[in-house]
């Protein structure tokens, strides 16, 4: 089930909210869990089995890891057993055919592919369970003794499908003791509607340009650049829109989820970009892979190793394809180069450093979206006029004229400027009174326009659902 769908907005969500606020406090997590399982089973019920197995083993091994904390060998065995099951399920569902195909290529064999369907959101909930058991093993959190509460944490539908990757430590107190206020509900509704609008009115519209590019028989350099610009903006509004909706829904239910995006396209370095983009994933790899490997407190050779391991895994986390591996290693190379060579030089040239980051982002997401490594290189070559394409053509100029307004809104919307303007108007004074009237009207208007688009529009799932 999609957040940006009529059944979710006008049937599922209202019913869940009514039931959730009718039941007593001790039943709220049960309602949240059952509704989340229904939400997840809507598309493919059999995938619920994988999630239930992952939750139950995390629950059992979390308790055992805590019980045997004074026995290092036993508690470490619990950690590794849980990790093996979690990662085993993930690898079977997501990477089996990739590894079989690679093995066939290396050996010349023809082992049959398994053609395993990928359960939606498995990468997200696997990382949540892994972090929970690791934190119990480290003694950072107390093991959850109530299976329903732990299952509600993992399966909670606001963040189940595409994050943020919520740490158990961040919301453990809220699982038992959380407050529900009108202020939180209003904030949550506002955040949800804004995220929904980003998804439907910007990401979906930009996706139409991307589809036109991919279906065109012939393209020009201008069209390739339009595609690259549309894709990076589409990906941002698609994913950050989902995160906004997840955070908003979580707040309505009394949970305070971490932020996942902080205007990444204003970054002045690749390092800064990854502090602002998909922050929950970046912090997960930092705390559970990079730092345990030694971080930057090791020799230069080991630091290189740590960087490349983290980014190889980051690429693989996004998908079982050589393009994702290349995408991860692409960032590893430029992060390393920034740290060692030209990072200080970038700090001296403000305009050029922003241009540099945007150019690298465009190239990186061309790789990310490519169907093959060779296709990625062809598109990158075309960006720089090396593919033998004409500079422009009638179709590219048509889309440039047609989408110039959308691009303008999207570019401004990807900066802190709109939020800054709203914040200034919302401060004490006449502006605050005006905003108290204007904001609800604008939000209701956005919801009405989004609803009209959804009634008349085509199916367009969130891009990060496939991860």
Regions found by a protein language model. Name each.
Residues 1-466:
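Membrane-embedded transmembrane alpha-helical bundles that form the catalytic cores
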């Amino acid at each position: 089930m999609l957040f940006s769908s009529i059944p979710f907005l006008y049937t599922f969500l209202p019913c869940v909210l009514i039931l959730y606020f009718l039941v007593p406090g001790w039943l709220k997590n049960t309602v949240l869990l059952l509704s989340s399982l229904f939400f997840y089973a809507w598309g493919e019920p059999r995938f619920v089995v994988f999630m239930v197995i992952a939750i139950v083993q995390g629950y059992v091994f979390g308790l055992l890891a805590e019980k045997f904390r004074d026995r290092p060998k036993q508690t470490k065995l619990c950690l590794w057993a849980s990790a093996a099951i979690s990662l085993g399920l993930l690898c079977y569902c997501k990477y089996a055919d990739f590894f079989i195909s690679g093995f066939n290529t290396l050996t010349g064999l023809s082992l049959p592919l398994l053609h395993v369907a990928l359960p939606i959101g498995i990468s997200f909930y696997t990382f949540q369970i892994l972090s929970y058991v690791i934190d119990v093993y480290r003694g950072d959190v107390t093991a959850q003794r109530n299976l329903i509460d732990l299952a509600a944490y993992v399966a909670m539908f606001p963040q189940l499908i595409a994050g943020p990757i919520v740490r158990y430590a961040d919301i453990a107190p809220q699982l038992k003791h959380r407050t529900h206020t009108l202020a939180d509900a209003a904030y949550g509704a506002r955040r949800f509607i804004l995220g929904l609008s980003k998804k439907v009115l910007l990401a979906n519209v930009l996706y139409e340009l991307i589809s036109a590019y991919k279906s065109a028989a012939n393209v020009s350099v201008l069209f390739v650049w339009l595609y690259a610009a549309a894709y990076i903006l589409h990906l941002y509004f698609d994913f950050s829109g989902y995160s906004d909706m997840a955070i908003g829904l979580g707040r309505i239910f009394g949970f305070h989820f971490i932020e996942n995006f902080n205007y990444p396209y204003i970054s002045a370095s690749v390092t800064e970009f990854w502090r602002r983009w998909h922050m929950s994933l970046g912090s997960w790899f930092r705390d559970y892979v990079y730092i345990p490997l030694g971080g930057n407190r090791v020799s230069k050779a080991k630091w290189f190793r740590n960087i490349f391991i983290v980014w190889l895994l980051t690429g693989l986390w996004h998908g079982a394809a050589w393009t994702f591996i290349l995408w991860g290693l692409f960032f590893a190379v430029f992060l390393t180069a920034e740290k060692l060579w030209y990072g200080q030089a970038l700090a001296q040239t403000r305009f050029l450093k922003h241009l540099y980051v945007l150019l690298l982002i465009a190239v990186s997401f061309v790789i990310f979206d490519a169907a093959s490594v060779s296709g990625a290189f062809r598109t990158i070559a075309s960006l720089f006029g090396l593919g033998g394409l004409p500079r422009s053509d009638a179709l590219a100029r048509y889309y440039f004229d047609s989408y110039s307004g959308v691009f303008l809104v999207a570019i401004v919307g990807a900066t802190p400027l709109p939020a800054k303007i709203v914040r200034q108007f919302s401060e004490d004074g006449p502006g605050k009174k005006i905003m108290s009237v204007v904001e609800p009207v604008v939000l209701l208007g956005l919801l009405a326009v989004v609803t009209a688009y959804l009634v008349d529009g085509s199916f367009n799932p969130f891009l990060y659902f496939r991860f």
